[in-house]
């Protein structure tokens, strides 16, 4: 497995190492980056929470959970509510094998 380090810095945020996504070594990098994007987006749950999560006392299955995602930055708890991380967006980046790839409007671009 190859480790893809995900950093959020879009929207003027400070660079934050938010997660690592582990993907099989034989997956081409550009294809793997698309997997990283999907696995760090909130579509039907919260990618940064476990296999289930609770909202107002009700437990839900988390379709966005993946055992291949390691959340690096702890989740925010405010007023007793645990908030998941935001989705990966344009301006965020991933580092793999020492190369930085910026999340672009469409796809990924290797940093110069």
How should these model regions be labeled?
Residues 72-84:
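Short alpha-helix capping/helix-loop boundary micro-motifs
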Residues 43, 79, 103-104:
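Acidic, low-complexity intrinsically disordered regions
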Residues 84-112:
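Short, compact, well-ordered microdomains
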Residues 1-73:
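N-terminal non-globular leader segments, chiefly Sec-dependent signal peptides
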């Amino acid at each position: 497995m190859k480790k893809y380090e995900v950093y959020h810095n879009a929207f003027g945020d400070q660079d934050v190492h938010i997660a690592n996504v582990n993907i099989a070594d034989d997956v081409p990098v550009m294809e793997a980056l698309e997997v990283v994007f999907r696995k760090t987006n909130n579509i039907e749950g919260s990618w940064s929470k476990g296999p289930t999560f609770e909202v107002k006392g009700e437990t839900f299955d988390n379709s966005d959970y993946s055992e291949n995602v390691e959340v690096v930055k702890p989740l925010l708890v405010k007023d007793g509510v645990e908030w998941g991380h935001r989705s990966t967006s344009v301006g965020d980046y991933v580092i793999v094998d020492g190369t930085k790839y910026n999340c672009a409007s469409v796809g990924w671009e290797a940093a110069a």
